[in-house]
UniProtKB/Swiss-Prot annotation:
The keyword Disulfide bond applies. Alpha-beta TR is a heterodimer composed of an alpha and beta chain; disulfide-linked. The alpha-beta TR is associated with the transmembrane signaling CD3 coreceptor proteins to form the TR-CD3 (TcR or TCR). The assembly of alpha-beta TR heterodimers with CD3 occurs in the endoplasmic reticulum where a single alpha-beta TR heterodimer associates with one CD3D-CD3E heterodimer, one CD3G-CD3E heterodimer and one CD247 homodimer forming a stable octameric structure. CD3D-CD3E and CD3G-CD3E heterodimers preferentially associate with TR alpha and TR beta chains, respectively. Disulfide bonds join C42-C110. InterPro entries: Ig-like_dom, Ig-like_dom_sf, Ig-like_fold, Ig_V-set, TCR_variable_region. This is T cell receptor alpha variable 8-1. Its main location: membrane. Pfam families: V-set. The gene is TRAV8-1.
Length: 113
């Protein structure tokens, strides 16, 4: 059985105005068996219009954009089978993947702008 260790960190982008915001991620380290489903929680505190992002950093590589939400359909499809759902009433943008692979081992970052 292969296990995935997925460290999860939060990131905040600065706004152009003075309103405060923050991001919190529920899962700081996740260990999963290969083919298990993954859900990483991300909540933000900001009442205005937001742009939401998930980034991934694979071992030894640079940070790369996994998916983003600006407006429209709240279910966002990303690369490599990842998706995230924007739920405005809960201030959440949770990342999901129905079946993780060993190659998904990485650090995942939720961000709001």
């Amino acid at each position: 059985m292969l296990l995935l260790l997925i460290p999860v960190l939060g990131m905040i982008f600065a706004l152009r105005d003075a309103r405060a915001q923050s991001v919190s991620q529920h899962n700081h380290h996740v260990i999963l068996s290969e083919a298990a489903s993954l859900e990483l929680g991300c909540n933000y505190s900001y009442g205005g219009t937001v742009n939401l992002f998930w980034y991934v950093q694979y071992p030894g590589q640079h940070l790369q954009l996994l998916l983003k939400y600006f407006s429209g359909d709240p279910l966002v499809k990303g690369i490599k089978g990842f998706e995230a759902e924007f739920i405005k009433s809960k201030f959440s943008f949770n990342l999901r993947k129905p079946s993780v692979q060993w190659s998904d081992t990485a650090e995942y970052f939720c961000a709001v702008n």
